[in-house]
Amino acid sequence: MLDGASTAPSEAERCIIAMMLMQIALDTHDEVTDDGGDLRARQLVVLAGDLYSGLYYELLARSGETALIRSFAEAVRDINEQKVRLYEKKVERIESLFAAVGTIESALLVKLADRMAAPQWGQFAYSYLLMRRLLLEQEAFIRTGASVLFEQMAQIAFPRAKTLTKEQKRHLLRFCRRYIDGCREALFAAKLPVNGLLQLRVAELSGGFQAIAKKTVEEG
């Protein structure tokens, strides 16, 4: 994304650091639970998240990046709105559920891509991060039978079922895999100038890691 951006390297680096600080702040606040644990520990986690958020704001404010502050604020608003929808289980369609997850995972990167005048990279990030999250949830569901995402999928698809049958589980897995395949196709169709590391990440995520490793050994 940075190779094709018209932004100066130092400016681009500052924007990326700010985005990472904001993401850390969000992730830190997500660790706060209401399970009745130690109150002081929870307060410290909140303060840690606020610290990262403050560092992000200070970095951009000092450099006069008010437009990016607004953009990231919009992303945080969208992320939090979708988190609330998921938490309160207000999503009525599985397609909307996956769209909410995609927004939560990628909204900050999408805004950064817009700032770099490279919206195609925002679309790439959306597909990549959504696929990664779906694969993690799918693995958890297959391995342990427990997945927050699949639990909500089940409530949408089979609202009256107290316990899922094998066929119902297979139905949910097929639906998830269809979306994973869609994300994979979007990544390969993008044809963006990705570097070697990102190529490896995408290949590994999409199931092509073993083929690449074998080819590397054969050619090496």
From Swiss-Prot:
EC class name: transferase
UniProt GO molecular function: heptaprenyl diphosphate synthase activity; transferase activity, transferring alkyl or aryl (other than methyl) groups
Keyword Transferase: yes
A GO BP entry: isoprenoid biosynthetic process
Signal peptide annotation: none
Pfam families: HEPPP_synt_1 (PF07307)
Keyword set, alphabetical order: Isoprene biosynthesis, Transferase
E.C. no: 2.5.1.30
Transferase keyword on record: yes
Reactions performed catalytically: 4 isopentenyl diphosphate + (2E,6E)-farnesyl diphosphate = all-trans-heptaprenyl diphosphate + 4 diphosphate
Subunit: Heterodimer of component I and II.
Role according to the record: Supplies heptaprenyl diphosphate, the precursor for the side chain of the isoprenoid quinone menaquinone-7 (MQ-7).
Name used for this protein in its record: Heptaprenyl diphosphate synthase component 1
Gene: hepS
